[in-house]
Design a protein with these regions (language model features):
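Structural motif
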Residues: 98, 123-125
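Broad, structure-driven detector of short, well-ordered beta-strand segments within folded domains
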Residues: 108-116
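Alpha-helical interaction segments
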Residues: 37-39, 118, 138
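Helix N-cap / beta->alpha transition motif
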Residues: 67, 113, 141-144
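Residues in well-ordered beta-strands of folded domains
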Residues: 102, 113, 126-128
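Compact, glycine/acidic-enriched structural inserts
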Residues: 127-154
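A short alpha->loop->secondary-structure connector
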Residues: 116-122
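A surface-exposed partner-binding patch
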Residues: 1-109, 153-159
Length: 159
């Protein structure tokens, strides 16, 4: 198991230990995850996929992770990262190889840069803002989704 997936397992344990401070869905099956990847034209890294399988979408102590989910009101459409990524492409010019995983009041969009995969299939996490001039000006906020999610969940629980 890679360090990024180990971090995701720690997020799962943290969420399970703090059920009173969090909300989550039931998780995604392989068919839903494959459909989400096809719709975006991107592949989930293993650490994000593990959390999507477990929760689908989740929120802990006010920190919302989009994930992937469907709702009856959505008419079967894939929501969360899929909807946010496709919408950001259409509305604000999000590059096609970035995947939205969170929107934050400090960083604007938190994205995975799928053009920079490592040997484990993990992508670095960046803050992306429609006003940025080029990739070099994006702020790196995590080495992988798993490590980023763990840090954010721990920070949210400590406040």
């Amino acid at each position: 198991m890679t360090r990024a997936v180990e971090a995701s397992e720690r997020v799962i344990a943290l969420v399970r230990e703090n059920e009173d401070n969090m909300n989550h869905a039931d998780g995604c099956d392989v068919e839903v995850l494959n459909a989400a990847e096809r719709e975006m034209g991107l592949v989930f890294p293993p650490s994000y996929r593990r959390l999507l399988e477990e929760f689908g979408t989740w929120e802990i102590a006010g920190k919302e992770f989009f994930g992937v989910y469907k709702s009856p009101a959505g008419g079967g459409a894939l929501l969360g990262s899929v909807e946010q990524t496709l919408e950001a492409r259409r509305q604000v010019g999000l590059p096609a190889d970035l995947m939205v995983v969170m929107v934050d009041d400090v960083w604007a969009y938190v994205v995975l840069d799928t053009s920079r995969g490592d040997q484990d299939g993990e992508y670095p996490v960046f803050a992306w803002n429609p006003g940025l001039q080029g990739r070099d000006s994006m702020e790196r906020v995590g080495e992988s989704f798993g490590s980023f999610a763990l840090e954010e969940c721990q920070r949210a629980m400590s406040t």
